[in-house]
Regions:
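Short, acidic, small-residue-rich periplasmic hinge/interaction motif at the N-terminus
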Residues: 31-34, 41-46, 75-80, 89-132, ...
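Surface-exposed extracellular loop regions of Gram-negative outer-membrane beta-barrel proteins
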Residues: 267, 315-316, 320, 531-579, ...
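Membrane-embedded beta-barrel scaffold of Gram-negative outer-membrane proteins
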Residues: 363-367, 373-377, 570-624, 629, ...
Length: 794
């Protein structure tokens, strides 16, 4: 019996040793075609039921059974799946795997190639160059089509995010905050934005709950990184709305990109109801030089010069508005002209040093922004407002508008940044010192004469309907600092764990102009559960401030009919508490990849500075007088609606309220619903023909008569409805030719802007009769226009 037990024990021992000998360890790293590690790529052996995910550095480690052949599959959304066959593996095996980009997602890739962990989504606009565009600002037009974002003018690159104003959106280029012009009051004047889409490499955009490294704005953060090309490249494009050229040069240690853009929307403005001589000319040049004298040193320089001229001599205008049963006609004959100038200089210089451990980097950045702005016009008009059916005169008179607005602004900054990476943490901090100098000298007035009487009519004195004077200087110094950590950790089963990404940080700022110091703690958590790798939950909260700048400071007081604008030193930062919960689900339908995102948010607003909006001009009350809220839900479906092309559909529902002087009213940017659709398609059987369709349908904004209290908001404008379609033909494709050429692609395009010719309302002109009765005459946006374009890529 003892002998039998001994045999059994020895047999079990040899069996266990044999089983142990049949296992092996597989380890390695997964990276993209450029050698960058791919996080959360799946490494699976389906025959053995084994699955692990790569870590932050793209590394993996898995224990497997040794067989004659072991089939290992490497997969990640946005990349081509790769399979490796291991023959009789033993001991420890190491694999270095590179995944190629998935060409089936080569159209406009809106989401990043990895699941979105934080509140910042990664956008790619390089293929938007073939989409129809009225502004030529591809990045901003891409932003305007995202969930929670809206615009009400195709002439403007500005956008509202979840009930916020244009001024509540921060923009960064290579870690330096940039600014928009101060005096711009209409989309016609805007010209080109500071972001050159040809030079953009990465775009990060957050609609709320963003990280502590992004500045003191309440609504959104746009983070732009300019490209460092790996080889010489370039393009030249031209259309009826302007032209652009881009050249990128690359050597072993140096890259140099240059972009030149010219825009004239004279052709587009010809479809407006106000006829006259439009002479808009916008010119922009940018350069980005990056030099690596050693592997651990990098020196960067960005320079920008922008010159925007807007000259206009109106002649006449006729507008018909109202209902089918009650049609009114508004006719004006003009004298005078407008002449505006916006000249901007911007530059940054950065030195970055990586320590020997290659995990820590230190950067010193300096920047300078300078703008010179002039807005000058003297325009007189004789108008008639009549009832069309009865020819009854509802208002007859003359008005004269005068403006001499001059502004100079200079902002200089120096910033020290520190970044430290480990396997699970990415710690980042910075300190910034800014010097702000702004000088304004403005004089505006508007005079109206209705049926021989000056408006407003008192029977005694002569008054202007509006008169404003401002002579102000701002000398401010601002200190900003932040510290944040991005922590990756996991729990549960080692082979298929639940993945977490926690971002937490705090931001501090002090401004000597009003003596205010603000602290802004922020945090977000992303969870990818073990039971479904295609599902991600995100939660974010934080205290956000809108630090006042020049426009918010302008407080007004009226003496003897003249409004004086002065700077309010007692104003405080507006405040918003964000609470966000979202879900992202990645799936396949019809054997094509899709992604559905749903996000709910609530923003508690306090210490608000009320403002009114006319076209794109935001005029503030100059004091913290209100509180309120903004809440809603944003839905987005992204994927291949048609094989080989990416499209997306967004739906946003929102409710905003502001309590002002004891009365609850909607915010001036209250938009109860918005639908955006971007669709890309190819002709069957060929990639030479491409079609892009952009659709926007958004609720109208609340309006009230000018120079009246904001709480007397009287009505809501009609919904904004617009469809643009573009057809592109690839005349030349170098990849299809055996004999190579300097050109990679040549595209010919034809766009139809405002396909259905819908008359959208941008703002209102208010006609007042002698009885002080006011009539709102709509100012319509552009009509249907055809645009031709050509693009050479090399």
């Amino acid at each position: 019996m003892k002998t039998f037990r001994l045999y059994i024990t020895l047999a079990l021992l040899f069996l266990s040793l044999g089983m142990k000998a049949q296992t092996f360890t597989l380890q390695g790293k997964v990276s993209d075609k450029d050698g960058h590690p791919i996080e959360l790529a799946s490494v699976s052996v389906l025959d053995q039921g084994k699955l692990v995910m790569t870590n932050l550095h793209g590394e993996f480690h898995i224990e497997l059974q040794s067989e004659d052949s072991v089939k290992v599959v490497f997969a990640m959304v946005g990349y081509r799946t790769k399979t490796r066959i291991l023959r009789h593996p033993r001991g420890k095996q190491t694999l270095q795997v590179q995944l190629a980009d998935d060409n089936m997602l080569n159209e406009v890739v809106v989401e990043g190639k990895t699941p979105q962990h934080g509140t910042t989504q990664q956008l790619d606009v390089k293929d938007m160059k073939t989409a129809p565009s009225a502004t030529g600002n591809a990045v901003e037009e891409m932003i305007q089509s995202q969930a929670g974002v809206s615009t009400h003018s195709e002439l403007s690159s500005q956008y509202n995010v979840r009930g916020g104003s244009f001024d509540e959106n921060s923009v960064y280029i290579n870690n330096v905050e940039v600014y928009r012009p101060f005096l711009v009051r209409s989309g016609q004047q805007e010209g080109l934005s500071i972001i050159n889409p040809d030079m953009v490499d990465k775009v990060g955009f957050a609609t709320g709950g963003f990280e502590a490294k992004y500045g003191d704005k309440m609504s959104s953060a746009l983070d732009i990184t300019y490209k460092r090309p790996k080889h010489t490249e370039g393009n030249i494009s031209a259309s009826l709305l302007g032209a652009s050229g881009y050249l990128g040069i690359a050597t072993k240690n140096l890259t140099w990109t240059n972009g030149l853009r010219y825009k004239t929307n004279r052709y587009l403005l010809g479809s407006l109801e106000t006829e006259g001589e439009y002479k808009p000319n916008f010119l922009d040049y940018q350069t980005y030089l990056s030099w690596k004298p050693k592997s651990n040193w990098q020196i960067d320089f960005i320079g920008n010069i922008s010159e925007n001229h807007y000259n206009f001599e109106p002649e006449d205008r006729e507008t018909r508005f109202g209902t089918m049963e009650n049609v009114k006609s508004f006719r004006v004959y003009f004298d005078g002209k407008e002449k505006d100038l916006f000249r901007t200089y911007f530059g940054t210089f950065a030195i970055t040093h990586k320590l020997k451990n290659n995990k820590t980097s230190i950067s010193l950045l300096g920047s300078a922004f300078s703008t010179r702005e002039q807005e000058r016009y003297d325009i007189q008009g004789q108008y008639w407002l009549t009832q069309t059916e009865t020819s009854e005169n509802l208002g007859v008179g003359t008005y004269m508008e005068h403006s001499r607005d001059y502004l100079k602004a200079n902002v200089k900054s120096v910033k020290l940044m520190l970044n430290h990476r480990t396997a699970k943490h990415n710690i980042e901090g910075a300190v910034t010192y800014k010097i702000e100098r702004i000088k304004e000298n403005s004089a505006e007035y508007e005079y109206r004469d209705s049926a021989g009487y000056s408006v407003p009519h008192t029977g005694k004195d002569l008054y202007m309907i509006y008169s404003m004077r401002a002579n102000n200087e701002l000398h401010g110094n601002r200190v900003e600092a932040y510290l944040q950590d991005n922590w990756h950790f996991r729990s549960g089963n080692d082979s298929v764990p639940t993945l977490y990404t926690l971002n937490y940080g705090v931001r501090f700022a002090h401004w000597n102009f009003n003596g205010e110091s603000i602290f802004s703690p922020r945090a977000s958590l992303s969870i990818t559960p073990s039971f479904n790798r295609n599902l991600t939950f995100r939660f974010a909260t934080g205290l956000y401030y809108q630090a006042p700048f020049y426009k918010e400071l302008r407080d007004t007081s009226t003496v003897n009919g003249i409004t004086y604008a002065t700077l309010n030193k007692d104003i405080k930062s507006q405040r918003s508490i964000h609470a966000i919960a979202s879900m992202e689900y990645r799936f396949e339908m019809m054997n094509r990849p899709f992604k559905f995102t749903a996000e709910m948010y609530y923003k508690a607003l306090s210490r608000l500075v009320p403002y009114s909006v006319n076209n794109v001009k935001v005029v503030y009350y100059g004091d913290n007088e209100a509180s309120g809220h903004a809440m809603g839900i944003d839905l987005k479906l992204f994927g291949e609606f048609v094989p080989g092309s990416d499209s997306w559909l967004t739906l946003s529902l929102m409710d905003t309220k502001m309590k002002l002087n004891g009365k609850s009213i909607p915010l001036p940017t209250d938009q109860r619903y918005a639908v955006n659709f971007f669709f890309t398609d190819y002709f069957p059987g060929t990639t030479r023909w491409k079609m892009n369709l952009k659709l926007a349908y958004a609720d109208g904004l609340p309006f009230s008569a000018p120079h009246r209290e904001l709480e007397n908001s009287s009505f809501r404008a009609p919904a904004y409805k617009r469809v643009d379609i573009g057809m592109s033909y690839r005349l030349y494709d170098n990849n299809e030719r055996t004999k190579k050429s300097i050109f990679k692609n040549i595209w010919l395009g034809l766009d139809c802007l405002n396909l259905f010719g819908i008359s959208n309302v941008n703002s209102y002109y208010w006609v007042t009769d002698v009885t002080n009765q006011q009539y709102a005459v709509p100012n319509y946006l552009t009509g249907r226009q055809i645009n031709g374009r050509v693009l050479f890529e090399f």
